[in-house]
Amino acid sequence: MAMAYLAWRLARRSCPSSLQVTSFPVVQLHMNRTAMRASQKDFENSMNQVKLLKKDPGNEVKLKLYALYKQATEGPCNMPKPGVFDLINKAKWDAWNALGSLPKEAARQNYVDLVSSLSPSLESSSQVEPGTDRKSTGFETLVVTSEDGITKIMFNRPKKKNAINTEMYHEIMRALKAASKDDSIITVLTGNGDYYSSGNDLTNFTDIPPGGVEEKAKNNAVLLREFVGCFIDFPKPLIAVVNGPAVGISVTLLGLFDAVYASDRATFHTPFSHLGQSPEGCSSYTFPKIMSPAKATEMLIFGKKLTAGEACAQGLVTEVFPDSTFQKEVWTRLKAFAKLPPNALRISKEVIRKREREKLHAVNAEECNVLQGRWLSDECTNAVVNFLSRKSKL
């Protein structure tokens, strides 16, 4: 959530510098000038159809839609070229300018054709690696299954390293609320693909409210607080199966789980200070308790990346397994847990956790308030500029 807000704020800011920052690719469109021209009504219907898409078409397609819309309604690009650090507006300008002198009628037709090609996404589902049994419906970013007394919530954006976008935040909350009431005995979170989760998705910057950056920061803080609260209040045993690298909030939340099992190829990284931010997920409280204040400081403030073995030695991870046998060993154990008396598990968790719950909610509220201020700071924006410039040189 923090990363997504920062990406948007960075994109809105023009910083005079010689740094080269990654931006969206210039859109290349193949136009058919002899195609039948779409009517104005067809054009308007297509604009409405875009709002009904259930699956995010991706940034490149969004830029194409933007460019074609501008070309169809205003003609060739007539805006001055934005500065190099005004990432979003520069990407929009590049996309629109690439259309050259394409007639409005042709742009309108291409807009209609593009939207028509996207229509299958109204019914498409998220991609799942072969062998994954999808038994849930209604989720675009998750695979949720319930079998053998286990509800499994799998992050399902493997091509994006399971980065958490706004839709996934809401879907995880919905899945947790459903799992708290279903017949399963335990609930497991894991990732599809090579990553457990790479943390927040930096492309969460398009839904900007009329109130601008201040309202965006406030809304994100409210969402983050509610999201973390779902983990604090979850009544059943909650287990993380960390199948690969974990970054940011996917790490900080682990202090709220009842058990954490990791592959030996997993790593744990919280680069908050590098991005001018502060801890989240109650980690400012749970991590010092779990691993000592000194070790928590090394990770949360100085951004040390832990191996699975180091995370286990410091108490963040329950047990580490060889990657070659990880899935088999862990799921054998989880199936055994799911055969234990369910009421005993819930009651025992309540006894262990209830004294901390009020404190955790207070910590969560404080962390979100602090982050709201950090997201609005120049220091935070500058840190993200430096991060993106380094990334572009890799």
UniProtKB/Swiss-Prot annotation:
The keyword Mitochondrion applies. GO terms for molecular function: delta(3)-delta(2)-enoyl-CoA isomerase activity; fatty-acyl-CoA binding. It catalyses: a (3Z)-enoyl-CoA = a 4-saturated (2E)-enoyl-CoA; (3Z)-octenoyl-CoA = (2E)-octenoyl-CoA; a (3E)-enoyl-CoA = a 4-saturated (2E)-enoyl-CoA; (2E)-tetradecenoyl-CoA = (3Z)-tetradecenoyl-CoA. The modification N6-succinyllysine is found at K51, K55, K62, K70, K81, K90, K92, K161, K289. The record marks E280 as: Important for catalytic activity. An acyl-CoA binds at Y66, A67, L68, Y69, K70, K92, Y111. Keywords: Acetylation, Isomerase, Mitochondrion, Peroxisome, Phosphoprotein, Transit peptide. Residues 1-38 form a transit peptide. GO terms for cellular component: cytosol; intracellular membrane-bounded organelle; membrane; mitochondrion; peroxisomal matrix; peroxisome. CDD domains: crotonase-like (cd06558). GO terms for biological process: fatty acid beta-oxidation; fatty acid catabolic process. InterPro entries: Acyl-CoA-binding_prot_CS (IPR022408), Acyl-CoA-binding_protein (IPR000582), Acyl-CoA-binding_sf (IPR035984), ClpP/crotonase-like_dom_sf (IPR029045), ECH/Chromodomain_protein (IPR051053), Enoyl-CoA_hydra/iso (IPR001753), Enoyl-CoA_hydra_C (IPR014748), FERM/acyl-CoA-bd_prot_sf (IPR014352). Abundant in heart, skeletal muscle and liver. Expressed in CD34(+) T-cells and CD34(+) bone marrow cells. Pathway: Lipid metabolism; fatty acid beta-oxidation. Residues 151-322 are annotated as: ECH-like. Its EC number is 5.3.3.8. The modification N6-acetyllysine is found at K51, K62, K92. Residues 39-124 form the ACB domain. A motif (Microbody targeting signal) lies at residues 392-394. The keyword Phosphoprotein applies. It comes from the Eukaryota. PROSITE patterns: ACB_1, ACB_2. It holds the Pfam family ECH_1. Disulfide bonds: none annotated. In the C-terminal section; belongs to the enoyl-CoA hydratase/isomerase family. This is Enoyl-CoA delta isomerase 2. It comes from Homo sapiens (Human).
